[in-house]
């Protein structure tokens, strides 16, 4: 009887226990299901899950900074988690996003610094970034008032005998000159320095352009120097050549050298006076030269296409018939029986200036006028026994240092009245010092196999390497000072 009564109680006990277990199980399922639907409250959720970028205020200084890592930062997101986190996990999301933003910003800054560090391609580094202070100091400095100094390694800009474009008449070392101090002088303006010459940077500035030198044999002297100094900036020197296949000779008056890697040209156009030379026939049928001082030189059509022009005239105005002025100077159809050479020079420069004003676009073209280059004849002139041999260093004192010919004052007057700006390469006084720089007896030693007499010395032109290299250095410095060089 007692056994049958205890059995129902056992069943009831098991039933209660089972029911309680089921209730606890269902509550647990409900509880954990809710936690799963709210990940921001889940104990399994961490701040390491990447979140999307959102618009947030800047981070406060109290937040930790994460060091940048190489490579791109990629953030993958789940749309469901994004929506849930916005509803329940704002604090954690903000901290995570700020850390990711710091990584991206640091990576961006590092990339920009690396790009700046790379600079331009090798061989085309502009000296403007390296010698900015030197260039700025040149502004307001008279580049043509100074002295010649030596002792550093900058000059010569190329070694004697290394440049195949030097005329025999200017190749003094090959022609037997043994002293070499004249090669090592550089020009130092008072109050500033010229930027160090950079041939490659010069070529970069000439990229796609034409540089043309127009004038007499003094400008050919400078033209050959220009070819030589620019050649030093080429890694492959075979990429420079005369487009017509011509060798440089005294008799030819037009050369075009192409620099393939920079798509630029350097040209020379011979024009002794910049105005038109002609001839007239006399009663006996003979012809005599004339100079039309009111008409521009026949070569002017070539000038128009150049981007940078360097003009000169001067030395031919002191020779024979030009200086005498008898039945030589012409205006219109009238030939003057006698005319003053200085006045003819003035009118010729006005003719040139007028042509520049009417034909040059200053927004696209740049014009230089290279001033008179000093000669140093002793005991005569070029055709009357004048000499300069034996000079081995620059003039240190004397009246010649401050000598300034009337021709240069006329040049300055003409330029001042022009509408198109012209840069005057006023090399007169700096060449006054350099009595040691001329070929003298070390000019061209033979012509057609015949030895040239040393009784006629060249004290007008310059040995190369030599003084004209400085003229081209001054052109380079002037280009650096241009607002859009």
Curated annotation (Swiss-Prot):
A motif (DCXHWCLPGXXDXWN motif) lies at residues 458-472. It is found in: Membrane. It comes from the Eukaryota. Residues 67-110 have a biased composition (Basic and acidic residues). A motif (GDS motif) lies at residues 215-217. GO terms for cellular component: membrane. One of its GO terms (molecular function) is O-acetyltransferase activity. It is a single-pass type II membrane protein. Pfam families: PC-Esterase, PMR5N. Residues 65-127 are annotated as: Disordered. The chain crosses the membrane at residues 11-31. Keywords: Membrane, Signal-anchor, Transmembrane, Transmembrane helix. Belongs to the PC-esterase family. TBL subfamily. May act as a bridging protein that binds pectin and other cell wall polysaccharides. Probably involved in maintaining esterification of pectins. May be involved in the specific O-acetylation of cell wall polymers. PANTHER family: PROTEIN TRICHOME BIREFRINGENCE-LIKE 5, PROTEIN TRICHOME BIREFRINGENCE-LIKE 9-RELATED. Contains 2 motifs that are conserved in esterases, but it is unlikely that this protein belongs to the catalytically active pectin esterases. This is Protein trichome birefringence-like 5. The lineage of its organism: Eukaryota, Viridiplantae, Streptophyta, Embryophyta, Tracheophyta. The gene is TBL5.
